[in-house]
C-alpha cells in the first residue's frame, strides 16, 4: 500500500489481534477471560446505504482490511440496514448493483472482488468481517437504519420506533437474525441497538420499552457480544437515566453506552469560530459530561463509547480544527473508547450521486492512501491504552499537545521538545503551583523568557519552575517570568521543534465574546494520567 512509511511503523505495533469475547467492569471494556482492559480504537465503515461495505469496487477486500489494521485501528464499526436481512435476504451483490444502475461500481467490483458478486448481501458482509478478523480487527455491527438510505434527519422515516420505515417488530427480527448469525464469529465483539434515535416520535417510555427488549434479545441470542445503547436526540442525551436507570443490571457485564459528537452537533458549528475557544471547549465538555459522561460513574457505571466523531479532512476548517482539538483533549484525559467517522473514502451511491467522495474519511477516494497524514498523526496518543485500572505499573503523566497530536519529550539538549507519543517521556506533577518534573529525577521544566525554549533544570524552587493552569483555561500551563509576566507553554511546528513559553492568550474573565486573531490552541498542553508500560 502507498501509506507513508513512517506512519505505518508508528501504528502497526497495536494492530495485532485482541482477545475476545469482551466484557465490562465498571466504566471499562475488558478481556472477559483475563479481566485486563481492552481499549477500542475504531473506524466507521459504512455499509447501510447500498447494503454493502463501501470501497469494494476500488480495491481488493484484503487490501482494505489490511489498511484499517495498518492505520492502527483494532476495530471497525460496520453499519448495516435491517432491510438487508428482513427484505433483501436473497439479493446478491451483483443484483443489488444492477437494481441501482451502479454500472461503474459493478465493473470495479468485477475487477477487484469478483468472488463477492454472486454472494448474497449478508454473505458478502460476512466475508468482509472475516477479512477484517484475519488482520486482527474486531467488528462492532451497528444497526444504522431500517430502509437503506443516508442517515440522518428528523423526517427520514428511520428515526424512532414507529416511524414510517422503523417497525419495532421488523427491527427486533433483524437483531435476532444478526445476533444468531454471528454467534460463532468471535471477532464480532459487539452489536448496537440502533444509531441516532431522533425525530418527532421520540418518547422516553417507548425508548425504555424497546431498548430493554432489544438488549435482552441480543444477549439471549448471542451472549458473547457487547450490547451498545444509544440515547435520544441523535445519540447525545441520556440525562433521563439519572433518575431512572435501565433495569438491565448491566446485562451480565455486556452493557455499553454510545454517544456521538461533531462540530455541528446541536447547531453549534458557528460557535467554534465566533466564540472564545477556551470558553467553548469548557462548556461543550461540561455539556457532554452532563448528558452522557455521568454514565461512567456511580453504582451503575458502564463504559461510554464515542462511536462517532470526525471532521472534514480535505480542507483546513477553523471550526472543525478547534472542535476536534477540544474533543481529543477530553478523550485523552478520560481515555475513552472511540470510533472515527469515517474510515471509508467514498460511496457507491449517496443522495442519488454515484461514487461521491467521503471527505471525512481516513482513506482517500482511491482507498490506497491516508487522506490526511497530519490528522492521522493527531490520533497517535488516543490510539493507545493510557489507563488500565488493573495495571500494577506506577502512574505517570504524559504531556499531550492535542493541536499537533505530539507529546512533550525531554530533548538531549536539556530542553523540552515536541515528539512522538509512543514510549514518550514520563513526567510527574503534584498539582497547581508545583514543578513539572522528569519522573524519577530532580530535574524540572523552567521558563526563561517570552519566545524562548523551556529548559530542563535542577533549580525547581522558583516561580519560573512553578506551573499552574492559566486563568479561565482548562489546558494552558503557565508560570511567571522574572518580570512577573504570565507565560504559557506553546508549540508551533512552523516556528520551532522546541516547546517555547509565550505570553498567555487568555481572557481576564470567563467571557464567551473574548476573541483574538491569535487563537490559544497552540498553548494547550495536558498532563494526562497513564499507567501503561
What are these regions (language model features)?
Residues 2-19:
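Cleavable N-terminal signal peptides of Sec/SRP-targeted secreted and luminal proteins
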Residues 20-25, 397-401:
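Disulfide-bonded cysteine-rich modules in secreted/extracellular proteins
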Residues 24-243:
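Active-site mouth of glycoside hydrolases
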Residues 162-165, 169-190, 194-336, 356-363:
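Extracellular glycoside hydrolase catalytic/binding regions
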Residues 310-314, 345-347, 495:
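Short Gly/Pro-enriched loop/turn and capping motifs at secondary-structure junctions
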Residues 316-404, 514-520, 524-533:
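Aromatic-rich peripheral "rim/lid" segments of glycoside hydrolase catalytic domains that contact
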Residues 387-533:
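Lectin-like carbohydrate-binding module/patch detector with strong preference for beta-trefoil
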Amino acid at each position: 500500500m502507498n501509506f507513508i512509511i513512517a506512519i505505518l511503523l508508528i501504528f502497526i505495533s497495536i494492530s495485532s489481534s485482541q482477545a475476545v469475547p469482551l466484557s465490562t467492569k465498571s466504566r471499562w471494556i475488558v478481556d472477559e477471560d483475563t479481566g485486563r482492559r481492552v481499549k477500542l480504537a475504531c473506524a466507521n465503515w459504512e455499509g447501510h446505504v447500498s447494503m454493502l461495505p463501501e470501497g469494494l469496487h476500488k480495491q481488493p477486500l484484503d487490501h482494505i482490511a489490511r489498511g484499517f489494521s495498518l492505520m492502527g485501528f483494532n476495530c471497525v464499526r460496520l453499519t448495516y440496514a435491517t432491510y438487508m436481512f428482513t427484505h433483501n435476504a436473497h439479493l446478491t451483490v451483483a443484483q443489488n448493483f444492477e437494481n441501482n444502475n451502479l454500472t461503474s461500481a459493478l465493473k470495479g467490483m468485477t475487477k477487484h472482488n469478483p468472488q463477492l458478486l454472486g454472494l448474497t448481501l449478508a454473505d458478502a458482509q460476512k466475508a468482509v468481517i472475516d477479512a477484517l478478523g484475519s488482520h486482527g480487527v474486531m467488528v462492532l455491527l451497528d444497526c444504522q437504519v431500517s430502509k437503506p438510505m443516508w442517515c440522518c434527519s428528523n423526517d427520514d422515516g428511520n428515526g424512532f420506533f414507529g416511524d414510517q420505515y422503523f417497525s419495532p417488530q421488523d427491527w427486533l427480527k433483524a437483531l435476532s437474525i444478526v445476533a444468531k448469525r454471528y454467534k460463532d464469529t468471535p471477532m464480532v465483539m459487539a452489536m448496537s441497538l440502533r444509531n441516532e434515535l431522533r425525530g418527532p416520535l421520540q418518547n422516553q417510555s417507548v425508548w425504555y420499552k424497546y431498548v430493554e427488549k432489544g438488549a435482552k434479545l441480543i444477549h439471549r441470542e448471542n451472549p458473547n457480544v457487547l450490547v451498545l445503547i444509544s440515547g435520544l436526540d441523535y445519540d447525545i442525551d441520556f440525562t433521563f437515566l439519572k433518575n431512572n436507570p435501565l433495569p438491565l443490571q448491566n446485562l451480565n457485564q455486556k452493557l455499553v453506552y454510545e454517544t456521538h459528537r461533531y462540530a455541528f452537533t446541536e447547531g453549534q458549528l458557528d460557535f467554534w469560530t465566533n466564540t472564545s475557544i477556551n470558553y467553548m471547549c469548557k462548556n461543550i465538555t461540561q455539556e457532554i459530561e452532563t448528558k452522557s459522561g455521568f454514565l461512567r460513574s456511580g453504582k451503575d457505571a458502564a463504559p461510554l463509547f464515542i462511536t462517532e466523531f470526525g471532521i472534514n479532512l480535505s480542507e483546513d476548517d477553523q471550526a472543525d480544527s478547534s472542535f476536534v482539538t477540544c474533543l481529543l483533549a477530553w478523550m485523552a484525559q478520560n481515555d475513552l473508547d472511540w470510533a472515527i467517522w469515517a474510515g471509508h473514502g467514498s460511496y457507491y451511491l449517496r443522495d442519488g450521486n454515484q461514487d461521491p467522495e467521503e471527505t471525512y474519511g481516513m482513506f482517500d477516494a482511491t482507498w490506497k492512501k491516508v487522506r490526511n497524514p497530519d490528522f492521522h498523526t493527531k490520533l497517535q496518543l488516543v490510539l493507545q491504552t493510557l489507563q488500565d485500572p488493573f495495571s500494577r505499573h506506577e502512574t505517570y503523566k504524559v504531556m499531550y499537545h492535542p493541536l499537533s497530536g505530539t507529546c512533550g519529550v525531554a530533548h538531549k539538549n536539556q530542553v523540552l521538545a515536541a515528539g512522538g507519543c509512543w514510549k514518550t517521556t514520563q513526567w510527574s506533577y503534584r498539582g497547581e503551583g508545583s514543578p513539572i518534573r522528569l519522573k524519577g529525577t530532580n530535574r524540572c521544566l523552567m521558563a526563561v523568557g517570552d519566545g524562548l525554549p523551556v529548559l530542563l533544570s535542577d533549580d525547581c524552587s522558583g516561580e519560573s519552575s512553578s506551573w499552574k493552569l492559566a486563568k479561565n483555561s482548562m489546558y494552558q500551563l503557565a508560570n511567571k517570568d522574572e518580570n512577573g509576566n504570565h507565560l504559557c507553554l506553546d508549540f508551533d511546528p512552523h516556528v520551532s521543534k522546541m516547546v517555547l513559553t509565550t505570553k498567555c492568550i487568555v481572557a481576564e474573565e470567563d467571557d464567551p465574546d473574548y476573541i483574538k486573531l491569535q487563537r490559544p490552541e497552540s498553548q494547550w498542553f495536558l498532563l494526562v494520567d497513564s499507567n501503561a508500560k
